[in-house]
């Protein structure tokens, strides 16, 4: 897992192969196929792992916080701020994994098989994060009709803005060293909920 994260981050998902992973871990390519049918299923696994880990971070940050507004702020921070190293999990470099999520995660569900994979539960972890944050939104504004849309827009928009800042800077107003993404999405959400 750790080497696949390193290689996908280094070379990109399109160039990454199980043959290259096998060479990197000094194991036959066929040994990787015992665990994953193809590199797409590996990406789904990594994406699901990331979202379960993110949900744990949200739960930890929001437990015992009475104010729904503060829980929402903390959740938006986790969903939009850069990931820091978590030494509690030695076999996963969360910083590199988050880079993969920003640049490659759309490839997990922008496929022809998305409906079939959804029925198998492949996106359950991501949907759980969206539901958790949507529930907080509904605590603040019980009549708000679009909590899932707002939450998924924050997540995907933040990922796009991070990607644009690194690769297509003329498409964003993000400058390195400033937390514009978190500020933007926090303001967007709370202004939207005031309506």
Model-derived features: positions:
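An amphipathic alpha-helix adjacent to DNA-recognition modules
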Residues: 1-2, 36-59
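Helix-turn-helix
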Residues: 14-41
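Amphipathic alpha-helical interaction segments
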Residues: 20, 71-74, 78, 149-156
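Hydrophobic alpha-helical connector segments
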Residues: 45, 61-95
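Amphipathic alpha-helical packing segments from all-alpha helical-bundle domains
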Residues: 70, 97-139
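C-terminal peripheral helix-coil segments that are non-catalytic and often amphipathic
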Residues: 127, 131-142, 152-195
């Amino acid at each position: 897992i750790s080497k696949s994260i390193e290689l996908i981050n280094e070379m990109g998902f399109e160039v990454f192969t199980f043959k290259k992973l096998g060479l990197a871990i000094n194991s036959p390519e066929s040994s990787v196929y015992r665990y994953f049918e193809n590199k797409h299923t590996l990406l789904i696994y990594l994406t699901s792992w990331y979202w379960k880990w993110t949900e744990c971070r949200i739960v930890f940050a929001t437990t015992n916080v009475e104010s729904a507004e503060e829980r929402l702020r903390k959740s938006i921070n986790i969903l939009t701020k850069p990931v820091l190293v978590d030494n509690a999990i030695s076999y996963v470099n969360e910083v590199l994994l988050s880079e993969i999520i920003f640049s490659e995660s759309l490839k997990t569900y922008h496929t022809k098989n998305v409906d079939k994979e959804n029925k198998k539960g492949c996106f359950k972890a991501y949907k759980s994060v969206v539901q958790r944050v949507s529930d907080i939104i509904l605590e603040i504004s019980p009549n708000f009709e679009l909590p899932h849309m707002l939450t998924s827009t924050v997540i995907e928009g933040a990922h796009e803005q991070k990607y644009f800042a690194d690769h297509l800077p003329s498409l964003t107003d993000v400058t390195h060293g400033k937390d514009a993404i978190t500020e933007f999405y926090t303001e967007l959400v709370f202004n939207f909920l005031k309506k």
